[in-house]
């Protein structure tokens, strides 16, 4: 595989990278994981300081980034906006330029992706999108790594996604066609992806000869699936008053053992977590033979480690 010099690049959306660059990062993730479990310790982030600025609560993203930085020899600082002068009205451009002098990279988890772009505009050091309302690129990288671990390839696999069409879905939509996978969204009517991301995916699917579709029947969607991917029905940032409507709309989309039996014999079940048992899937599925969700969660650490190791100068 070719080597790529990604130093100084921001990681805000996978759409900023080629298939070859993304595959390079995934291979690096797998190499770092293999070395760690073989007892080999590498420290590409030794002497580096990474800031984690999180507006949204987090279990996996915060802990995986902190563990990744530590395992690669670096040091991380976790901050909330209400602890900074941002709370009193300091503009992002001032905060960004100050943090740029103190840290070697900034990892941001927030609401609007335009805020992440604004930080990147004012910083020379790399900025990483740790989740916005629009996209969750680090999750998509962990998903791709997990699929590669389980199948050994991506091309020709059928991935079925069911759940809220929000950041995680958008990043899957943007990456699945690029890696040669067919993608089916199984969602109720009225739950549509962002037009910009769907158009990007349509172009990639047409270029690579893959299938991209939205269906409103989960059982029909999962027939012949290699990967069944469920997600919460109600994402962070969505209005509280929509919760009950969403539960009603998505009620026919619970992944059960019966649903999984319609997929291929070797099919795997994925979920980015947190999972709400009895809603998007039953306990029998997430704890059953199909589930790879905790391998998937671990791989967040390794893909984030690779991203940081590759882009930090």
Regions found by a protein language model. Give the residues of each.
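Active-site cofactor/substrate anionic-group-binding motifs, chiefly glycine-
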Residues: 49-102
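Positively charged, low-complexity intrinsically disordered leader regions
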Residues: 1-63, 67, 135
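Short, structured coil segments at secondary-structure junctions
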Residues: 72, 102, 122-124, 179, ...
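Rossmann-like adenosine-cofactor binding region
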Residues: 203-283
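Adenosine-phosphate binding glycine-rich loop
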Residues: 266-267, 272-313
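Anion-binding alpha/beta catalytic cores of soluble intermediary-metabolism enzymes, centered on
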Residues: 40, 97, 104-175, 271
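Glycine-rich phosphate/diphosphate-binding loop of Rossmann-like nucleotide-binding domains
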Residues: 55-67, 149-231
